Amino acid sequence: MGRAYQNRKESMAKTSDAKAKVYSKFSREIYVTAKSGGVEPESNLALQGLIERAKKAQVPAHVIDKALDKAKGGGGEDFAIARYEGYGPGNSMVIIECLTDNPNRTFGDVRSCFTKTKTKIGTQGSVSHMFDHAAILVFAGEDEEAVLEALLMADVDVSDIENEDGKISVFVPHTEYAKAKTALVDAFGAIDFEVDEIQFLPHMTKPIDNEEDRELFEKFLEMLDDLDDVQNVYYDVEL
């Protein structure tokens, strides 16, 4: 069994409200990524991967273009990355990534999700030491030796490579993301990445055996998902 990462294939939202939420989260992340790293996907690999993910989630082109245009224009909202962590229901370990223009509001909203589920938000580092901050690149392939060689030739610090069900999964420290992706594309040409993300990966995962705690954990995730500022939630729970 491979490393536990979240393969967030954004499913088609069933309602207009759900679609609007998905579009808004992608729009905000595209804007911030383009503003910080440049609006050209060819030179901003994080933006390139994000746009591909947005397209797979069926985000309309006009939503993507509007976010890029806003980043080109300068000014606009001043979003900052905010990260919170703590112990959720069932003694789960949770990391919450946000993009916010009002950190005080966002902290209050996230803390409320903990409070309403009778859990407590933690201090920075309280659970993140039990996660790896890693880049994950997954694509169709069989020859993991060739992939490893290409990465090592480019002096990429490789954490792990898996070959399972006709797919190769590459794990590298998040700081090696651009170098690893460039090395793979240089070696093998255009690649359709099934997963192209930076995530927090738990060192170990566990089930929540108590049904009441499991239901409360799922409610906790739903509450976080309803917050506009929350972009990603990482946890050590097997659902």
UniProtKB/Swiss-Prot annotation:
It is found in: Cytoplasm. Pfam families: TACO1_YebC_N, Transcrip_reg. One of its GO terms (biological process) is regulation of DNA-templated transcription. The keyword DNA-binding applies. GO terms for cellular component: cytosol. Keywords: Cytoplasm, DNA-binding, Transcription, Transcription regulation. Its main location: cytoplasm. The keyword Transcription regulation applies. It comes from the Bacteria. InterPro entries: Integrase-like_N, TACO1_YebC-like_2nd/3rd_dom, TACO1_YebC_N, Transcrip_reg_TACO1-like, Transcrip_reg_TACO1-like_dom3, YebC-like. Signal peptide: none annotated. One of its GO terms (molecular function) is DNA binding. Belongs to the TACO1 family. This is Probable transcriptional regulatory protein Tcr_1104.
